[in-house]
């Protein structure tokens, strides 16, 4: 048996042992929907007209949940808030709840960019203010009167226990619960960037330790994106889709590949996919208002991060709910030669990375996407991608005219949708991007 096989066997053995020793978490008390006093903290940044939950026929309800957690020898109390974004009428509900713990920046940073697909598919979105900073730094200062009673003890284990208790509340389908008319079939936990660390902590601290009464998992699948650190994702008994970006892969520190990479698996006790998307950085201007206007030294990428994450979520949901096995993708390629082009990643003749999950933006290119944006202490720039648009000469060398370019984009787009690497609901966005590229006819160049 190889070292890799032995390690995998040990991980699975430990997981099976942990699963045999579980407890059913207590249900938290629930208040709500909360109607005041004053405005509700929205949990989302201002959105363009036509893209809000209300525009998709969604209702957002706020609830306060409270209970106790274990912290060392103590059992301190907590009280926090959850937001439930649900389709109206309930007949539109898919049976899927996609949850995430509020990022330390105060927003639901996975749902925010991927919301179009989540809402078109009728999923409920559950936002949990599970970290002490969510309450003390973000929510209470926004409206001290409305949120005066909220309090969360510090600590990652506290957050994990709150997630488990809220998950029990949602999965229990209580007649008086927040989703009384919405029969929940599956619950997923999502996490991006700092919140992906919350997801990892939950897997380690509560996934096997806190279970439903029948011993099944509270969380039915995990989506970790823009993940930090070098640790591999934990082996669990539900599907996991892991989507580190070029930012994490490029800074991974390995001679070949990244230390957090592990083999894809269809084993029922270890369902796992690694999706490294070519062209996608930790952050970009399309989905993050922070970059408008651009505070960075270099142009910030306008890559469709949300569309690619929605693709990963779709595969996760279908794998967990319907048993549809998702496709496998090659990892991003390395040449480990940062001195040559500023990147440890292997780049093609256009300056875009080789390998990974493909898309029209790198396969029918009009720009070069890279990482990092700029060194130094400006975090928002260090995690951003770069985008250098082709000049007129380069565009002319690639495409006969605009029609030729748009035709190539459409052809590749249809292939990607068929292969499962792009969702149909984003096709018009891709086409719109293509139509906006200024490629002049030959006689006018």
For each predicted feature, which ranges?
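N-terminal signal peptide c-region/cleavage motif recognized by signal peptidases
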Residues: 13-15
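Positively charged n-region of N-terminal signal peptides that target proteins for export
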Residues: 1-6
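C-terminal His-loop and adjacent cap/lid subdomain of alpha/beta-hydrolase
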Residues: 20-445
């Amino acid at each position: 048996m190889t070292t890799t096989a032995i390690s995998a066997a040990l991980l699975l053995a430990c997981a099976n042992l942990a699963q045999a020793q579980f407890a059913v978490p207590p249900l938290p008390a629930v208040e709500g929907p909360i109607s005041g006093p004053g405005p509700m903290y929205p949990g989302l940044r201002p959105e363009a007209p036509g893209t809000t939950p209300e525009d998709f026929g969604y209702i957002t309800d706020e609830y306060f949940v409270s209970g106790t957690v274990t912290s060392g020898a103590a059992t301190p109390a907590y009280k926090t808030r959850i937001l439930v974004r649900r389709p109206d009428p309930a007949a539109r509900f898919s049976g899927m709840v996609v949850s995430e713990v509020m990022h330390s920046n105060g927003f639901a940073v996975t749902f925010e960019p991927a919301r179009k697909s989540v809402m078109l598919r009728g999923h409920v979105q559950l936002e949990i203010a599970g970290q002490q900073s969510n309450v003390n730094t973000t929510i209470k200062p926004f409206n001290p009167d409305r949120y005066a009673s909220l309090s969360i003890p510090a600590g990652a284990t506290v957050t994990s226990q709150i997630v488990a208790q809220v998950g029990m509340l949602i999965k229990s389908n209580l007649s008086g619960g927040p989703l009384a008319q919405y029969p929940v079939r599956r619950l997923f936990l999502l996490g991006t960037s700092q919140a992906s660390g919350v997801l990892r902590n939950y897997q380690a601290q509560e996934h096997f330790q806190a279970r439903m009464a029948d011993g099944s998992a509270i969380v039915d699948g995990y989506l970790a994106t823009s993940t930090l650190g070098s640790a591999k994702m934990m082996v669990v008994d539900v599907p996991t889709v892991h989507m580190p970006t070029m930012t994490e892969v490029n800074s991974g520190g390995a001679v070949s590949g990244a230390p957090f990479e592990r083999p894809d698996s269809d084993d029922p006790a270890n369902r796992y996919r690694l999706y490294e998307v070519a062209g996608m950085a930790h952050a970009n201007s399309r989905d993050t208002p922070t970059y408008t206007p651009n505070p960075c030294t270099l142009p910030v990428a306008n890559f469709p991060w949300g569309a690619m994450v929605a693709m990963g979520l779709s595969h996760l949901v279908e794998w967990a709910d319907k048993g549809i096995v998702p496709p496998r993708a090659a990892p991003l390629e390395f040449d480990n030669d940062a001195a040559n082009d500023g990147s440890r990643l292997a780049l093609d003749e256009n300056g875009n990375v080789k390998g990974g999950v493909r898309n029209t933006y790198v396969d029918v290119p009009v720009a070069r996407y890279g990482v990092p944006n700029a060194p130094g202490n400006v975090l928002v720039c260090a995690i951003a991608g770069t985008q250098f648009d082709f000049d007129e000469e380069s565009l002319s060398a690639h495409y006969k005219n605009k029609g030729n370019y748009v035709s190539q984009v459409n052809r590749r787009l249809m292939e990607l949708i068929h292969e499962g690497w792009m969702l149909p609901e984003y096709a018009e966005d891709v086409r719109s991007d293509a139509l906006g590229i200024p490629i002049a006819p030959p006689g006018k160049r």
